[in-house]
Amino acid sequence: MDTKNIYYEHDDTSGTSICVEYEKYLYKCQSKYQNIEVIKTRIYGNVLCLDGCFMLSEKNQDYYHNECIDLTPKKSKNILIIGGGDYGIASLLIRRNKNTKITIVEIDKKVVDVSKEYFPKHFKLSSQQLNNINLIIDDGMIFLKKNLIKYDSIIVDSTDPVGPAKILYSKKFIKLCNSSLKKGGVIIQQSGSPINDMDKLIKPLVKKYDSVGLKSITISSFPMPLYPTGTWSFIKAKRA
């Protein structure tokens, strides 16, 4: 097989790689925060890669998004999404309940623009639905420091804890999330592979959640073919 048409994602910690054959590059740029690429593949359709890691594909994006939606209480009327610039989670939430108020805080506007161009599915919303989604281009940590609103649910839909996203897995950030939740509100955060990341990410994250007073902490796993090990997870907890 001609390796010039193979896109690799390699995990140094586990020493494993995942790869996909691509037909061509559709987009490539270096934003202020990360390297952004979109490749066209036969099996997965368009695929979004950030800093060399597979993020989103036309064919299997719903595994991730639907799992997150299922974890989000239906009674949530005011939801904050940190990250989520592809609009995948936001669009499914607004379709589930058109009266839901959603705030997306995405650090990189390029992610929104590229997603709208190459993954348009989640941007095909009615004017009423779009009016209920408030997009803010900002750092999630900075936003929470000045935030005065209490949310029913907070979803942290970020990249892995490296680079700009590293702070989103800190105790300081989780404490800010907790204080921004209504009583009984929930936080949902992507927590990596339950196979590769249990000791280095998931268990430490559970301890941080517990240390700030979050309760009913659970880990949910789901299939994600383009992510390392093919299985991914969300951590969920509730403000007491």
PLM feature spans:
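Active-site beta-loop-alpha junctions enriched in small/polar residues
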Residues: 192-194, 222
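C-terminal lobe and adjacent flexible extensions of AdoMet/dcAdoMet transferase-like proteins
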Residues: 236-240
